[in-house]
Regions:
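Alpha-helical transmembrane segments within multi-pass membrane transporters and channels
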Residues: 65-109, 116, 250-255, 285-286
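Transmembrane helix-bundle core of multi-pass membrane transporters
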Residues: 93-94, 98-169, 196, 220, ...
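Hydrophobic core segments of alpha-helical transmembrane domains in multi-pass membrane transport
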Residues: 54, 58, 76-82, 109-117, ...
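Membrane-interfacial amphipathic/re-entrant helices at transmembrane-helix boundaries
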Residues: 1-27, 56, 67-71, 98-101, ...
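Single transmembrane alpha-helix segments in multi-pass membrane proteins
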Residues: 10-61, 89-96, 101, 237-245
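Helix-loop-helix "hairpin" substructures at the membrane interface of multi-pass membrane proteins
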Residues: 21, 143-221, 245-251
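Transmembrane alpha-helical segments in multi-pass inner-membrane proteins
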Residues: 25, 29, 65-77, 198-208, ...
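Cytosolic-side transmembrane-helix boundaries in multi-pass membrane proteins
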Residues: 10, 89, 120, 181-188, ...
C-alpha cells in the first residue's frame, strides 16, 4: 500500500522519526519558553545544558555503572543545580538591564561549555546503549515501531503536559507568573521571589538535561549536539510565540512531523522547512502563533 506514491512503511517511518524529533523540539523549546516567559532571559546556553545532560548520563554509566533509569533522575538534578549556580552568580545581575546582555552572556557560556567538553571528550561521538527494557521493536503491521522511540514520545509528552499544567493550572504556577509581573505584590504574601526565580531557571535547565538523557540512546553524545539543535529550537519558540508554554509544545511536535514528512516528499527542503515556516508566520503574525500581541 502506498501513500501519495510512497510505500506506507517508509511514510510511517519518517512520520515516527518526525514525531521523535518533534518531542525533543517540544521539550527543549518548553524549557526555553519557561525561562523566557517567566524570567525574560533569552537563554542561548540551553543547547549546552542539553549537551551536558547527555554527558552526565554517559559519565554515570561509563565511570560509575549507573544505568539509564537512574540517569533520568540524576542528570536533571545535576544540571538543574548548575543552572541555579548560573542564575545566582551571573544572570541575576542582568534582569533590570537590556535583554541583549543576557543573550550575550548565555551565548558566551554555551561557547565555553562546548569548548570544555571538546577538550575533555574530543569531538568524536560517544554511544549510549538503549536500556534493556526498551530494546527491540513492535510490529504494528503497517510499520515496525522501535520501543525506545515510542518511549521518547510518551515521556516527552508526559513531561511537557505536566509542566504546562503546573504553570497554567496550579497555585504554584500562578505565583510564578505573578512573581514576574509584580514581584512586590507576591513578596507581600510572604513568597521569596528571588528563590522562586532561581528555582525556575534551575527547572528550565533540568528540562534541557532530561531531553539530553532521552536523546543519548538515539543520537551519539557529542559536544556539538546542543549547538546543532538550538537554532531550530529557537525557531520553534519564535513560531509558537515567545514565552508561550503551550505554543512551544504544540509547535515543537508539529514542526517535527512537518520536517519528517518533508524528508519523504521533498528531501532537499527538509533542512530549511522550519525556517521557511518561521518567516511566513512572522510576516503574518509577528508575535507567533500562540503569542500575545503587545
Amino acid at each position: 500500500m502506498d501513500i501519495f506514491g510512497i510505500p506506507i512503511q517508509a511514510f510511517m517511518g519518517q512520520l515516527m522519526l518526525g514525531l521523535v524529533n518533534g518531542s525533543f523540539y517540544a521539550m527543549l523549546s518548553l524549557g526555553l519558553a519557561v525561562i523566557f516567559g517567566l524570567l525574560g532571559i533569552v537563554n542561548f546556553a540551553h543547547g549546552a545544558l542539553y549537551m551536558i545532560g547527555a554527558y552526565v548520563a554517559f559519565v554515570l554509566l561509563d565511570k560509575f555503572g549507573i544505568n539509564y533509569w537512574f540517569a533520568l533522575v540524576i542528570s536533571p538534578l545535576v544540571v538543574g543545580a548548575l543552572g541555579v549556580v548560573i542564575e545566582r552568580t551571573l544572570l541575576k545581575r542582568l534582569y533590570k538591564i537590556d535583554p541583549i546582555y543576557g543573550l550575550l552572556l548565555t551565548f558566551g557560556l554555551a561557547l565555553i561549555a562546548e569548548g570544555v567538553f571538546r577538550y575533555w571528550f574530543d569531538v568524536s561521538g560517544q554511544s549510549y546503549p538503549v536500556p534493556d527494557l526498551l530494546q527491540g521493536a513492535t510490529n504494528l503491521g503497517f510499520m515496525v515501531l522501535p520501543n525506545y522511540r515510542a518511549w521518547v514520545v510518551f515521556a516527552s509528552l508526559t513531561v511537557c503536559l505536566g509542566t504546562w499544567y503546573t504553570i497554567e493550572r496550579t497555585r504554584l504556577g500562578a505565583y510564578l507568573r505573578a512573581g514576574t509581573e509584580n514581584p512586590a505584590l507576591v513578596q507581600a504574601f510572604g513568597i521569596n521571589v528571588p528563590v522562586m526565580v532561581m528555582l525556575t531557571y534551575g527547572a528550565g535547565a533540568g528540562l534541557a538535561a532530561l531531553a539530553g538523557v532521552l536523546a543519548a540512546p538515539v543520537i551519539q553524545v557529542t559536544p556539538l549536539m546542543g549547538s546543532n539543535l538550538i537554532i531550530v529550537v529557537f525557531a520553534v519558540v519564535v513560531i509558537g510565540g515567545m514565552g508561550s508554554i503551550l505554543g512551544s509544545i504544540l509547535t515543537g511536535l508539529g514542526l517535527g512531523i512537518v520536517e519528517g514528512l518533508t524528508k519523504v516528499f521533498y528531501p532537499e527542503a527538509s533542512s530549511i522547512v522550519v525556517f521557511v515556516i518561521m518567516a511566513i508566520v512572522l510576516m503574518i503574525r509577528p508575535a507567533g502563533l500562540f503569542g500575545k500581541e503587545k
